[in-house]
C-alpha cells in the first residue's frame, strides 16, 4: 500500500477571461506534490464549489491519490443519486487532479499514461461569426491566414465562445442583417429573443455564399445548438448536404435524441452530439446505432478523464470519432485535459478551441502553444499546467446567470439556449 495520502482539497474560483472558472487543487503529504483539475460549471459555479468543499474534500482526505479508478467509482455513488452536472463537475476536478498527480509521480505526461501519442499536433477548429454572409466570409479568411483549416460558421445567432462579448446571442442578433424575425407581442418578457424558423432559413444561404467564395478546401462546422424543432433539424441537415460540412453540431436536444434515427435515414450530413450529455445512457445508444459521427461531450460534465477515456475507446470500437467540447467556459486545465485525450486517442476527430487572453495565460502558466491551427502541449509530467493562486485571486467570480441562457422565441416562450 502506498504511503502517499491526500492532505487537502481546495476549490479555486477565478475569472481572468471574464468567465467564471473552477479549478480543484489536491495536495498530498509529499512536499510540493499536488494536482489540478477543472470543475467548471459556469452557470452554477458556487454550487460546484460547495459540493467540492463540503462533500468531496472530507471524502478524499486521507485517501491514496494513486487509486484513481476506485476514487472515481466510490465518488460517483457516494451521494446515492448520481450523474448530475454539479456533482459530475466536482468529481471531474478531483479526477483530473489525480491524473495530474499520477503523471508527476511517474515523471510522464498524462497522454503517456493513456497510451502515448497517436499524433504530433492537435488540429483545431475556431469560431467565426458575423452579421451577414460577407462578414462571416471576411472573418473566415482572417482565420485561414492564421493557419486554421477548420472553422465553425455562425450568422446572426448564438456565436459561441469565438466572440469576446459575453452577451453572445444579443450581440449576434443585433448585427444580423439578413435574418428577419417574427414580431413579438406588445409586452415582452425580459430575455434574449430568437426566431428559430428565420434562423433555419438563413443557414443554407450562408453556406451557399461561403462555398461559392471560398471553395471546398476549408472545412466548415455549424452549431444548431439544439434550438430548432426535430423536423426543422432534419430538413436543415438534408439541405446542407450539398455544402459538405465537416459536421452539423447538436441538431436536436438531448430530450429529442430519438429523432436522430430519422435524421440519419434522410441525410448524409455528418452529425456531432454530446455537449449536454451527463451519463452513459445518453451517448451509448447513439454510438451503438451509429447515429452520430462525432462525440463531443464536455469532459468535466461527464466526470473527468477517467470516463472520457472509456468513452473514447468505446467510440473507437464503433467508428465514432471524438470532438471534445472546448468553449470559453472551460479552464485552461480542462483545455489541457482535452488535449491529453486528443493526443492519445486514435479515433480523435477535431478539437474545438477558444483563444485565451493574456490574463488567462498569466494565471495558468503552461497553456498549450497554438501555431497555424494546431495545438502543442509541453512534455512536462502530469497535465503540464499550473495556476498562480495570487494572480487568480485578482479575478473574482461573479456567479451570475449568463444572459445568453435566457432565450425566448418571438412570442415570448422560453427556449433552449
Swiss-Prot record:
Binding site for Mg(2+): 223, 249, 275
Reaction(s) catalysed by this chain's protein: D-gluconate = 2-dehydro-3-deoxy-D-gluconate + H2O
SMART domains: MR_MLE
GO biological process: amino acid catabolic process; carbohydrate catabolic process
Record keyword Lyase present: yes
Classification via Pfam families: MR_MLE_C (PF13378), MR_MLE_N (PF02746)
Site feature location: Important for activity and substrate specificity: 327
Keywords: Lyase, Magnesium, Metal-binding
Group of enzyme by EC: lyase
Family matches, as InterPro entries: DgoD-like (IPR034593), Enolase-like_C_sf (IPR036849), Enolase-like_N (IPR029017), Enolase_C-like (IPR029065), Mandel_Rmase/mucon_lact_enz_CS (IPR018110), Mandelate_racemase_C (IPR013342), Mandelate_racemase_N_dom (IPR013341)
GO molecular function: gluconate dehydratase activity; magnesium ion binding
Active-site residues, record numbering mapped to chain: 158, 225
Amino-acid positions noted as binding substrate in the UniProt annotation, renumbered to this chain: 43, 127, 275, 296, 325, 329, 352
Names of the cofactor(s): Mg(2+)
EC number annotated for this UniProt entry: 4.2.1.-, 4.2.1.39
PROSITE patterns: MR_MLE_1, MR_MLE_2
Cofactor note: Binds 1 Mg(2+) ion per subunit.
Primary role: Has low D-gluconate dehydratase activity (in vitro), suggesting that it has no significant role in D-gluconate degradation in vivo. Has no detectable activity with a panel of 70 other acid sugars (in vitro).
Family: Belongs to the mandelate racemase/muconate lactonizing enzyme family. GalD subfamily.
UniProt name for this protein: D-galactonate dehydratase family member SeV_A0456
Amino acid at each position: 500500500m502506498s504511503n502517499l495520502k491526500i492532505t487537502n482539497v481546495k476549490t479555486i474560483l477565478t475569472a481572468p477571461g471574464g468567465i467564471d472558472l473552477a479549478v480543484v487543487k489536491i495536495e498530498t503529504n509529499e512536499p510540493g506534490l499536488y494536482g489540478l483539475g477543472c470543475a467548471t460549471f459556469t452557470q452554477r459555479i458556487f454550487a460546484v464549489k460547495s459540493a467540492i468543499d463540503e462533500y468531496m474534500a472530507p471524502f478524499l482526505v486521507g485517501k491514496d491519490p494513486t487509486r484513481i479508478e476506485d476514487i472515481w467509482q466510490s465518488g460517483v455513488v457516494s451521494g446515492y443519486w448520481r450523474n448530475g452536472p454539479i456533482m459530475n463537475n466536482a468529481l471531474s476536478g478531483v479526477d483530473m487532479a489525480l491524473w495530474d498527480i499520477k503523471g508527476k509521480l511517474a515523471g510522464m505526461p498524462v497522454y503517456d499514461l493513456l497510451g502515448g501519442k497517436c499524433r504530433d499536433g492537435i488540429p483545431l477548429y475556431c469560431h467565426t461569426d458575423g452579421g451577414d454572409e460577407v462578414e462571416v466570409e471576411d472573418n473566415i479568411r482572417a482565420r485561414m491566414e492564421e493557419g486554421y483549416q477548420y472553422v465553425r460558421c455562425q450568422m446572426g445567432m448564438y456565436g459561441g465562445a469565438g466572440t469576446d462579448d459575453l452577451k453572445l446571442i444579443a450581440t449576434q442578433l443585433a448585427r444580423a442583417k439578413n435574418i428577419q424575425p417574427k414580431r413579438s407581442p406588445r409586452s415582452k418578457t425580459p430575455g434574449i429573443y430568437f426566431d428559430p424558423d428565420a434562423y433555419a432559413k438563413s443557414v443554407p444561404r450562408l453556406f451557399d455564399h461561403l462555398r461559392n467564395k471560398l471553395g471546398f478546401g476549408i472545412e466548415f462546422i455549424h452549431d444548431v445548438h439544439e434550438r430548432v424543432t426535430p423536423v426543422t433539424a432534419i430538413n436543415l441537415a438534408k439541405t446542407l448536404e450539398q455544402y459538405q460540412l465537416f459536421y452539423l453540431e447538436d441538431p436536436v436536444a438531448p430530450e429529442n435524441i430519438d429523432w436522430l434515427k430519422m435524421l440519419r435515414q434522410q441525410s448524409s450530413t455528418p452529425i456531432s452530439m454530446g455537449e449536454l450529455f451527463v451519463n452513459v445512457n445518453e451517448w451509448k445508444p447513439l454510438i451503438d446505432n451509429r447515429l452520430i459521427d462525432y462525440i463531443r461531450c464536455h469532459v468535466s460534465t461527464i466526470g473527468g478523464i477517467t470516463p472520457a477515456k472509456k468513452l473514447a475507446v468505446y467510440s473507437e470500437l464503433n467508428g465514432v470519432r471524438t470532438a471534445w467540447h472546448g468553449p470559453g467556459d472551460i479552464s485552461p486545465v480542462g483545455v489541457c485535459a482535452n488535449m491529453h485525450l486528443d493526443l492519445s486517442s486514435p479515433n480523435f476527430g477535431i478539437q474545438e478551441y477558444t483563444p485565451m487572453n493574456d490574463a488567462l495565460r498569466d494565471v495558468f502558466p503552461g497553456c498549450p502553444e497554438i501555431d497555424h491551427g494546431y495545438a502543442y502541449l509541453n512534455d512536462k509530467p502530469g497535465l503540464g499546467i499550473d495556476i498562480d493562486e495570487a494572480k487568480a485571486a485578482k479575478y473574482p467570480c461573479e456567479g451570475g446567470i449568463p444572459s445568453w441562457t435566457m432565450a425566448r422565441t418571438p412570442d415570448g416562450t422560453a427556449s433552449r439556449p
